[in-house]
């Protein structure tokens, strides 16, 4: 049993990091109103600092508890890259939902575990072009198309490692075509935890034989 002093407890609640146990709590930056900002520059900056700090201490695994909805695409990619370039192995446990931007974040860690009732929502997102000059608007649309393709590729890479892809004997382009068709037909593609695992968008569900509890995640080396 760990005994925490006041500053360690404050770090968990104010900065989302348990340094002693190498755990990060990724959620929206807490504000005084009822709106949940989701992935934004505030949550991203705190998260990036926490990952860097724990990496400077040691290369022991980091457990990330994620409970955050969608949000800003660029801040999402900043967090995604931070996880991908962590020298320490990263394990993510997702609570409640992985929607839009946070479904992308779910693809970054080495090991991705879902709570049993998590839903995963994947879509292309949206862009704003209020009062933009026509040339600027065209550039924004072109950039958005490239970023949408980048997003699909992130999911395709994970899907290609799944049992489903092996059973269907999918080549990479076949998996990409399937994912794009799901996004085109459904707009918001919503998957249960079990479906997300079957597609390779997560590795397992908490409570399984391999990962029966949160404590079992702490034993991963």
Question: Where on the chain are the PLM-derived regions?
Answer:
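N-terminal organellar transit peptides
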Residues: 1-221
């Amino acid at each position: 049993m760990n005994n925490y002093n006041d500053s360690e407890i404050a770090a968990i609640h104010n900065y989302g990091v348990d340094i002693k146990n190498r755990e990060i709590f990724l959620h929206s930056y807490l504000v005084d109103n009822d709106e949940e900002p989701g992935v934004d520059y505030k949550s991203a900056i705190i998260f990036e600092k926490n990952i860097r700090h724990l990496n400077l201490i040691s290369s022991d695994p980091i457990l990330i508890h994620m409970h955050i909805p969608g949000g800003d695409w660029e801040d999402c990619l900043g967090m995604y890259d931070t996880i991908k370039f962590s020298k320490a192995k990263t394990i993510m446990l997702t609570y409640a939902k992985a929607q839009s931007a946070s479904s992308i974040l779910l693809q970054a860690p080495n090991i991705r575990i879902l709570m049993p009732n998590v839903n995963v929502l994947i879509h292309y997102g949206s862009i704003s072009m209020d009062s933009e000059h026509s040339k600027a608007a065209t550039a924004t649309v072109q950039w958005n198309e490239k970023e949408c393709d980048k997003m699909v590729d992130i999911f395709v890479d994970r899907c290609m490692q799944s049992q489903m892809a092996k059973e269907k004997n999918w080549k990479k382009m076949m998996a990409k075509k399937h994912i794009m068709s799901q996004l085109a037909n459904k707009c918001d593609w919503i998957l249960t935890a079990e479906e997300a695992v079957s597609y390779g968008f997560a590795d397992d569900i908490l409570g399984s034989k391999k990962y029966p509890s949160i404590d079992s995640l702490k034993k991963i080396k």
